[in-house]
Design a protein with these regions (language model features):
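N-terminal segment of the canonical double-stranded RNA-binding domain
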Residues: 1-34
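Double-stranded RNA-binding/processing signature
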Residues: 38
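Compositionally biased, intrinsically disordered low-complexity regions
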Residues: 17, 30, 34-35, 69, ...
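Acidic, low-complexity intrinsically disordered segments
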Residues: 41-79
Length: 79
């Protein structure tokens, strides 16, 4: 599992191979707050698949960055 740091958050990329041979985008945003760790799962669209793990991870990373940006700017219902 590849880990990426983005604006103080850790993003764990964990795209999964489908039985059909394609790849589905998956990631986890890890938030360290006070003495707690929160893990927020990020999933690509259910029907979207990619030809390679690299493509799926790239899409999962972009979705994760959007989630983090929304959290920072209050777009996720959190401040």
């Amino acid at each position: 599992m590849r880990k990426v740091s983005y604006k103080g958050h850790t993003i764990e990329l964990a795209s999964a191979k489908l039985r059909s041979g394609g790849w589905v985008a998956r990631a986890t945003v890890v938030i360290e707050e006070e003495k707690r760790t929160k893990k927020i799962p990020i999933f690509g669209r259910r029907r979207a698949s990619f030809d390679s793990k690299r493509e799926a991870d790239s899409y999962a990373l972009e979705l994760s960055k959007l989630w983090v940006d929304g959290r920072i700017w209050g777009g996720n219902g959190r401040s």
